[in-house]
């Protein structure tokens, strides 16, 4: 801990002045109004090549135009350099929005609340958002336009975050739907207002909504306890969403309540996640046969089922076969009364109930949902030999779907789309005395600029243009894969080169830190063939060209490109004792599995 005198003398800002001097020059009593730095943050934070930490520190005096320009020039040079060699993540760096949209940077555009309710905050782009949502509803085979009176029509919105927000919202929607919750008007709201008025306190009657949860039947205490399933290649945002929404996974329930009944390996520990095909060495797609066994175990005990599928996993770019999985699970759900069931919302009136599914299938299509429809079009036109399985609303068992806008499409910031059907929103029943309002977007304020970005991109790019772009990126993925295989042969070194069919990513042995930084490579530890391996991957997005791949291959050809790795799997050095009654908690990975 620094002394007060040391704190006051910490150098700060581009002029390298002591903090106390800066504060004193402004006539501020630093003891009462602002706290000094505990230490020099430029020595604490990561140092970025090409960036002067001092030039970016925000002095209480502000920055002069010259200082600001110096910092911004460094910023531009750094970002331009990193963008030029960007290969490691699934984001399109080839953007074209400046000419059309730069004039709107001085507008505060807020798509507040539901996109289908214009509202009184009129500086918004909801009319553009609705056009974007209709576009993707058509592309994903949903019924459109949105019609609140048509339960089969789509509902959705443009996300302010990436697909992480959509995954969280989808899991939230699924939890409330499966746990038998209803959104109702509070019948006491009007009575409260009447009572206040009798006391000469004029009071409006605000619409006050309450959540009500139905009670499970006596013969099935598990009827409204959802259990979640997702593969070991699932993005961590899904796993975090389960924790935030307090949804138990099959691993948690199995370990806690059925420790010796693991259907995949009786008597052995439960898997934390549904295994992927061939484990870490496989493509990354969910193992459907094992999923079916796990789901049937819990369906037989009356639990409603929540399955999160992937369509373009973050690290391997794998696609779950949603159609085959759904068809395999439907007979099980029908067998145990989970295909459709009555959900009563008024114990006093048995005739008041909803008919709901006892399952929810969510598709995380952060990457694949943006471009696979165009691969399908190319396949149908005979332009490509293969396509991936269906994943969208043509499958009657799909409840919700998310896609990121900053990945294959390309955007200056994270954004995305969440879509479901109107009938799956948490809505009040139809009887007048119970009418509330539909549950709507996750965030109140939403970035209106994101809808404009989507609209501008789609207005410039026809289906034909996007088919050409999809084929370009697919062909480049095959090209880069072959180049890495040739390098492996040339070096006579196993580089662990792997490529999931029709994915845009190629993974290989992690090179040295300089190469990782230059190309912004995403790295991850995988346990493969009884070895602990450090992998990295590259994504073939629209900005990638032959010159960039050739330069990467040249760098990887250098003698010190691939440091030796210790692939031995070490045992824990300290034995950890856990009390018998301690519960096993959900495991959330903090590294790897890409990003949203």
PLM regions: where:
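Conserved C-terminal alpha-helix-loop-beta "cap" of PLP-dependent enzymes
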Residues: 69-73, 77, 216, 239, ...
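A short small-residue
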Residues: 109-115, 309, 453-460
């Amino acid at each position: 801990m620094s002394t007060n005198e040391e704190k006051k003398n910490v150098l700060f800002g581009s002029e390298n002045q002591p903090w106390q001097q800066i504060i004193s020059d402004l006539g501020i009593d630093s003891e009462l109004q602002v706290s000094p730095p505990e230490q020099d943050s430029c020595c604490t934070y990561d140092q970025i090549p090409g960036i002067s930490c001092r030039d970016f520190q925000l002095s209480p005096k502000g920055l002069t135009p010259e200082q600001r320009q110096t910092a911004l020039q460094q910023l531009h040079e750094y970002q331009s350099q990193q963008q030029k060699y960007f290969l490691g993540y699934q984001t399109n760096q080839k953007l074209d929005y400046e000419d059309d949209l730069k004039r709107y940077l001085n507008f505060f555009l807020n798509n507040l609340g539901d996109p289908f309710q214009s509202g009184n905050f009129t500086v918004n782009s909801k009319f553009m958002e609705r056009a974007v949502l209709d576009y993707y509803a058509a592309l994903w085979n949903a019924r459109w336009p949105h019609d609140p009176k048509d339960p089969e029509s789509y509902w959705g919105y443009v996300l302010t975050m990436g697909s992480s927000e959509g995954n969280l919202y989808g899991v939230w929607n699924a939890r409330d739907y499966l746990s038998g919750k209803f959104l109702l008007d509070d019948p006491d709201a009007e009575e409260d207002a009447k009572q206040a008025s009798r006391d000469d306190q004029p009071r409006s009657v605000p619409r006050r909504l309450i959540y009500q949860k139905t009670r499970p039947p006596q013969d099935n205490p598990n009827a409204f306890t959802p259990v979640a399933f997702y593969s070991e290649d699932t993005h961590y945002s899904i796993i975090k969403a389960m924790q935030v929404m307090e949804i138990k996974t099959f691993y948690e329930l199995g370990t806690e309540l059925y420790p010796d009944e693991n259907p995949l390996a009786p008597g052995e520990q439960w898997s934390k996640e549904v295994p992927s095909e061939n484990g870490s060495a496989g493509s990354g797609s969910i193992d459907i046969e094992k999923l079916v066994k796990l789901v049937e175990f819990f369906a037989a005990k009356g639990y409603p089922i929540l399955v999160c599928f992937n369509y373009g996993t973050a690290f391997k770019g794998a696609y779950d076969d949603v159609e085959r999985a759904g068809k395999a699970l439907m007979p099980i759900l029908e067998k145990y009364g989970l295909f459709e069931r009555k959900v009563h919302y008024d114990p006093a009136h048995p005739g008041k109930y909803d008919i709901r599914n006892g399952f929810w299938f969510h598709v995380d299509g952060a990457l694949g949902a943006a471009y696979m429809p165009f691969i399908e079009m190319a396949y149908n036109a005979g332009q490509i030999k293969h396509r991936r399985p269906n994943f969208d609303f043509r499958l009657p068992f799909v409840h919700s779907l998310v896609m990121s806008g900053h990945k294959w499409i390309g955007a200056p910031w994270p954004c995305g789309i969440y879509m479901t059907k109107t009938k799956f929103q948490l809505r009040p029943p139809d009887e007048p005395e119970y009418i509330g309002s539909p549950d709507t977007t996750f965030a109140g304020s939403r970035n209106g600029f994101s809808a404009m970005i989507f609209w501008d991109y789609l207005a410039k790019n026809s289906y034909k243009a996007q088919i050409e772009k999809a084929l370009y990126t697919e062909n480049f993925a095959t090209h880069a894969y072959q180049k890495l295989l040739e390098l492996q042969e040339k070096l006579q070194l196993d580089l662990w080169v792997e490529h999931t069919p029709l994915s845009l990513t190629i993974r290989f042995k992690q090179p040295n830190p300089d190469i990782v930084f230059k190309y912004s490579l995403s790295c991850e530890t995988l346990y493969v063939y009884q070895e602990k391996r450090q992998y990295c991957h590259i994504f073939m997005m629209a900005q990638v060209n032959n010159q960039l791949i050739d330069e990467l291959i040249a760098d990887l050809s250098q003698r010190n490109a691939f440091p030796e790795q210790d692939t031995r799997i070490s045992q824990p050095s300290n034995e950890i004792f856990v009390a018998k009654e301690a519960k096993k908690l959900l495991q959330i990975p903090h590294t790897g599995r890409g990003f949203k």
